[in-house]
Curated annotation (Swiss-Prot):
Main location: nucleus
UniProt name for this protein: Single-stranded DNA-binding protein 2
Region (Disordered): 147-171, 194-361
Residues bearing the modification Phosphothreonine: T333
Origin species: Homo sapiens
Entry keywords, A to Z: Acetylation, DNA-binding, Nucleus, Phosphoprotein
């Protein structure tokens, strides 16, 4: 039926081969519909001199046209006015459902897009091997992406995921990662060493303060009842975005554990690493103490913020400016001294653990 060129059927046909096949199919169609004189006239006019092998009726051209016409009539814009088969309608419906959606169209609610510069190779090319034009898998953004915005997730999960535990030589136990809570922007400084300081405004975008909270080794996580979220806001780019602590491994969050309940500001924030302060106090990460992740700040009530910890401790967090951070519904009085400006807390200096303290939001 294919005549010349059948041996090259596996190769891409050339234009001349395509014209020859079309001429054969037209001749075959004319013969099958009973137009023998027209078929012979057609061959003589195109000066066909090769042997012809006919296929079974109704022939390829007729069969191909019927399939095309059925699919053409079953298109969504014509299916109401043209007759079509259920198979053709199902084909169009499947093709519409399997059409590739725009990028970010299938992002799960718990994953977010990065804010600020995206590292090279962040968006890896992906395509379904079986259906190249079919549905693409959802684009998964790692929770440790730079400035990732998490979705609706609990602040402190009651159980840790054993499959995500990682050990570190500088920590007493395996470093257990937690899913970041709502409203918090996790920082993933895996591109920077423990002693390196990433540039400001490189980990967060405008209005997106960064704060990486997670456990170190030691005691298990507390499970506060009313610890829903820690809301805070920033109207200036890059505020409260800082690199990992001086001694912590990359990606280790820094949440302090208060030493005691005195009014001295030296009890909770001691042994600060020497990092030059910046304007508007741009660098304020918090990290775990050696006694347990988020040991004491796992839930501070309002009176702990203003009363027992004193103005020298947590009151300096709340500033009288749009670049403030609120860890409680009752922030302390603002103050302007540079006691904590731009410095990083040593994640291994806090020594007390208060499991009875709960966070009030």
């Amino acid at each position: 039926m294919y005549g010349k060129g059948k041996s090259n059927s596996s190769a891409v046909p050339s234009d001349s081969q395509a014209r020859e096949k079309l001429a054969l199919y037209v001749y075959e169609y004319l013969l099958h519909v009973g137009a023998q004189k027209s078929a012979q006239t057609f061959l003589s006019e195109i000066r066909w001199e090769k042997n012809i092998t006919l296929g079974e009726p109704p022939g390829f051209l007729h069969s191909w046209w019927c399939v095309f016409w059925d699919l053409y009539c079953a298109a969504p814009e014509r299916r109401e006015t043209c007759e079509h088969s259920s198979e053709a309608k199902a084909f169009h419906d499947y093709s519409a459902a399997a059409a590739p959606s725009p990028v970010l169209g299938n992002i799960p609610p718990g994953d977010g897009m990065p804010v600020g510069p995206v590292p090279p190779g962040f968006f890896q090319p992906f395509m379904s091997p079986r259906y190249p034009g079919g549905p693409r898998p959802p684009l998964r953004i790692p929770n440790q992406a730079l400035g990732g915005v998490p979705g609706s997730q609990p602040l402190l999960p009651s159980g840790m995921d054993p499959t995500r535990q990682q050990g570190h030589p500088n920590m007493g136990g395996p470093m257990q990662r937690m899913t970041p809570p709502r409203g918090m922007v996790p920082l993933g400084p895996q591109n920077y060493g423990g002693a390196m300081r990433p540039p400001l405004n490189a980990l967060g975008g405008p209005g997106m303060p960064g704060m990486n909270m997670g456990p170190g080794g030691g005691r298990p996580w507390p499970n506060p009842t009313n610890a829903n979220s820690i809301p805070y806001s920033s109207a200036s780019p890059g505020n409260y975005v800082g690199p990992p602590g001086g001694g912590g491994p990359p990606g280790t969050p820094i949440m302090p554990s208060p030493a005691d309940s005195t009014n001295s500001g030296d009890n909770m924030y001691t042994l600060m690493n020497a990092v030059p302060p910046g304007p508007n106090r741009p660098n304020f990460p918090m990290g775990p103490g050696s006694d347990g992740p988020m040991g004491g700040l796992g839930g501070m009530e309002s009176h702990h913020m203003n009363g027992s910890l004193g103005s020298g401790d947590m009151d300096s967090i709340s500033k009288n400016s749009p670049n403030n951070m609120s860890l409680s519904n009752q922030p302390g009085t603002p103050r302007d001294d540079g006691e904590m400006g731009g410095n990083f807390l040593n994640p291994f200096q806090s020594e007390s653990y208060s499991p009875s303290m709960t966070m009030s939001v």
